[in-house]
Amino acid sequence: MELKTSYASDNYPIIVKHHAINSLERYIKNEEQRFFIIDKQVYNLFVDKLEALAQKFDAKCIVIPSGETSKSFEHYHRTIEYLLSHQLTRQTCIVAIGGGATGDFAGFIAATLLRGVSFVQVPTTILAHDSSVGGKVGINSEHGKNLIGAFYRPKAVIYDLDFLETLPYSEILSGYAEVYKHALLNGEKSTKNIESNFTSNKVLQALKNLDYYLFEGIKTKLNIVVEDEKEKGKRKFLNLGHTFGHAIEYEHKIPHGHAVMIGILYQFIVANHLFETNYNIQHYINYMKKLKYPLSIIKQLHFEDTYHFMLLDKKNDYNGIQMVLLKNLGKPVVTHVDKDTLLSAFEELQSYFK
């Protein structure tokens, strides 16, 4: 499966299939220098394959720590100085091979190196089906997640489904949260469809029909970001579950998608408090439990600590915290939420887990 973005210019292909890595050559063969920035776990799992690929294209491998730990200013500084020591020209290509954090980090390197060099995304996780598309790149600050960054489009996104076959279940759960989020944004039909396909942890672990839902998720995201690349309006809808999710992810260092799924649950409760919605919260809790999401951390949360990190969210303005909420499935809105409502919803969330 393949599709292409539809911006006014500078469009790029998104290739989703098994053995997609074979398409890499056409996007990097004309560059003078090539660097593969690779997630450590991915490198260890596919070392022979990746070293052979690097040798084929005369590329240097830079292996970085797995996950969010790589997205520090210190690691950025060390990596960019290493790259600059190679007397680079702008005919340099950075290839990100890893999950969402690797793509964020390598993309920010590419965006800032010599004011911008070529960049190819090779996502290796389910989670990265979301982050690799749309052009957001960046690193973290001590004040919060993704607060230092840029909008920078890749030359191509090459999504080789072969990489997904080695994912541990925790990573599958993390990625599925974003796939599920896209279904919620699409509406009731898409939500019922995905829930009826992934009915248990065993079905999800088998990745049944996953390629279809990944492709649908990518299309959903593209339909939004092509209209609003710089997140001035409707692109904010893609942050469904992320205001609360990012806060607990950053505070408790849990996997991104695990936190987002809890954030999705929380926004349903907030929506019930603010709007005339009547979401069946227990239904969503039961569904998450069927898939074996680790929800016990909800009991450990403290409102004031979580609220502090919610205040750092990039969607906020001088009027306070803004959240993406679903007025109905498929009908997202961005709205301010006062502290009292947030606290009341927080207390209700915890009440389900006593």
From Swiss-Prot:
| Residue stretches spanning the membrane | none
Keywords in alphabetical order, please.
Answer: Amino-acid biosynthesis, Aromatic amino acid biosynthesis, Cobalt, Cytoplasm, Lyase, Metal-binding, NAD, Nucleotide-binding, Zinc
Enzyme Commission number, as recorded: 4.2.3.4
An example molecular function term from Gene Ontology annotations? 3-dehydroquinate synthase activity
Sequence positions that bind NAD(+): 66-71, 100-104, 124-125, 136, 145, 163-166
**Function of this protein?**
Catalyzes the conversion of 3-deoxy-D-arabino-heptulosonate 7-phosphate (DAHP) to dehydroquinate (DHQ).
- Which family does this protein fall into? Belongs to the sugar phosphate cyclases superfamily. Dehydroquinate synthase family.
Recorded protein name is 3-dehydroquinate synthase
